[in-house]
């Protein structure tokens, strides 16, 4: 089987968030199980081609759009899968992938629309002849539209994965003309969305299958609360909507081999985790290692429940616990957390993101905080548990699928239902009680380290989906 896998970011080449982590790990794992995989990504200015061994090949692709010709040079890297990188410096030779902190680039429709065309042209010209094309999020969502309407590849199945429905790629209606899509696609059953063009909607309508990154999120997005205006469309196409839980690469996230943490350990030497805690507290200036250490790692954004942390900070400062917060994001949150750096003796704050430092945090912590308003899947909780860190999270999306409250039989985490301050604080206090029950706490640390959240499980389910689509069988995953 041959699969083309397309994403706007793929780790380790380019990353702004969890999308890159999963699109970096998944195609490689699928390829390792016997599928021929061709990955595609724009070649951004920020990609270090020398570091990653990416080489230019004797190929280019021309895309005619908006009375312009956009020429893409082609670069290539071969590891577990074959990756192609399409380079156009006018469109992608910029400082950011999607736009500066102030907002998205205004020509993102042309940028990613032309990239989608370039992928399809390269597939055609190089006779890749894939059985299936797998695209991710709005940036690549025009590919199922083009595959069906422009290239008439009705035999080539397409899968679109929705990693976060909040981002849809919505542009003014004249994007239809700029992208040579034709006004016959500007209607409610295609790309039209409240008199605008919606890339993600097009991908949903014209794909052979829709996947999301957890079973619970697949259900949630068919309701208005989580549907971001597309819940009706998703209900209509629910017969081809599947929730496949993301996973993490256990070779990348492994406390036994992680070169960034203070002391390596495994489930059999978990007592060494306390060395990581002691040295981390010393590094950041926190005291009393006998207290539980809570960490937050992530985007400082409304979606991540950062308001709950901000509004609870005074109460947190009085708890018998230490806190470490690492993240950057929206300016308002950045400014707030910078303003209280060093204010509380039990709260360390670093408004930044550094993966090496985050690994030290995972290895040192007793609890990870994930108070998200919604969470399509979440990888942080899986990473935390891999490192023997228990999770305090809101009962939503992928968190519901991966964290089981200790009040339940075989539970191993702390969940709270509503995104309100009192419930969040109650969850923190419940975690303190759990921590003080040393025998139970230590047994749960070992338990979560042995739960299998490997990307291998995700890859196997996608291969089943691909085969079902290729052979027009009933999908059973």
From Swiss-Prot:
UniProt record, GO biological process: glycogen biosynthetic process
UniProt cross-references to Pfam families, sorted A to Z: Glyco_transf_5, Glycos_transf_1
Binding site for ADP-alpha-D-glucose: 15
Substrates-to-products reaction catalysed: [(1->4)-alpha-D-glucosyl](n) + ADP-alpha-D-glucose = [(1->4)-alpha-D-glucosyl](n+1) + ADP + H(+)
Signal peptide (UniProt feature, chain positions): none
GO MF term (any one): alpha-1,4-glucan glucosyltransferase (ADP-glucose donor) activity
Enzyme Commission designation: 2.4.1.21
Pathway: Glycan biosynthesis; glycogen biosynthesis
Keywords per UniProt: Glycogen biosynthesis, Glycosyltransferase, Transferase
InterPro entries xrefs: Glyco_trans_1, GS/SS, Starch_synth_cat_dom
Family label: Belongs to the glycosyltransferase 1 family. Bacterial/plant glycogen synthase subfamily.
Role, per record: Synthesizes alpha-1,4-glucan chains using ADP-glucose.
Listed name of the protein: Glycogen synthase
Organism of this sequence: Sulfurihydrogenibium sp. (strain YO3AOP1)
């Amino acid at each position: 089987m041959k699969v083309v896998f397309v994403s706007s970011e793929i780790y380790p080449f380019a990353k702004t968030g969890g999308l890159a982590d999963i699109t970096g790990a998944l195609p490689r794992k699928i390829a390792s199980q016997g599928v021929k995989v061709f990955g595609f990504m724009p070649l951004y200015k920020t990609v270090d081609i020398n570091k990653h061994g990416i080489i230019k090949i004797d190929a280019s692709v021309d895309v005619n759009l908006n009375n312009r010709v956009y020429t893409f040079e082609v670069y290539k890297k071969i590891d577990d899968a074959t990756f192609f990188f399409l380079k156009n410096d006018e469109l992608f030779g910029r400082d950011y992938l999607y736009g500066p902190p102030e907002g998205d680039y205004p020509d993102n429709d042309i940028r990613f629309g032309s990239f989608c065309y370039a992928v399809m042209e390269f597939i055609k010209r190089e006779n890749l002849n894939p059985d299936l094309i797998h695209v991710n999020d709005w940036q690549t969502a025009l590919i199922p539209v083009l595959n069906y309407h422009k290239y008439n590849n009705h035999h080539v199945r397409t899968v679109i994965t929705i990693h976060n429905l909040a981002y849809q790629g919505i542009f003014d209606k004249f994007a239809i003309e700029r992208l040579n899509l034709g006004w016959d696609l500007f209607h409610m059953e295609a790309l039209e969305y409240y008199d605008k063009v919606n890339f993600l909607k097009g991908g949903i309508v014209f794909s052979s299958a829709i996947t999301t990154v957890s079973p619970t999120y697949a259900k949630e997005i068919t309701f208005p609360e989580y549907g971001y205006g597309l819940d009706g469309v998703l209900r209509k196409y629910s017969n081809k909507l599947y929730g496949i839980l993301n996973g993490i690469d256990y070779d990348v996230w492994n406390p036994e081999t992680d070169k960034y943490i203070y002391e390596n350990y495994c489930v059999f030497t978990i007592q060494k985790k306390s060395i990581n805690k002691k040295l981390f507290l010393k590094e950041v200036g926190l005291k009393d290692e006998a207290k539980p250490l809570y960490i937050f790692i992530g985007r400082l954004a409304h979606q991540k429940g950062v308001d709950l942390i901000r509004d609870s900070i005074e109460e947190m400062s009085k708890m018998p616990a230490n806190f470490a917060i690492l993240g950057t994001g929206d300016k308002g949150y950045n400014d707030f957390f910078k303003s209280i750096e060093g204010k509380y003796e039990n709260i360390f704050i670093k408004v930044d993101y550094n993966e090496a430092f985050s690994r030290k945090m995972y290895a040192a912590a007793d609890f990870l905080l994930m108070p998200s308003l919604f969470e399509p899947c979440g990888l942080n909780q899986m990473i935390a548990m891999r490192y023997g860190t228990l999770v305090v999270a809101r009962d939503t999306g992928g968190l519901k699928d991966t964290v089981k409250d200790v009040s339940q039989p075989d539970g191993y985490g702390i969940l709270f239902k509503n995104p309100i301050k009192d419930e969040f604080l109650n969850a923190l206090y419940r975690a303190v009680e759990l921590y003080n029950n040393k025998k139970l706490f230590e047994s749960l640390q070992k338990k979560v380290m042995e739960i299998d959240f490997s990307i291998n499980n995700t890859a196997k389910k996608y291969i089943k989906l691909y085969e079902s689509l290729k052979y027009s069988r009933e999908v059973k995953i």
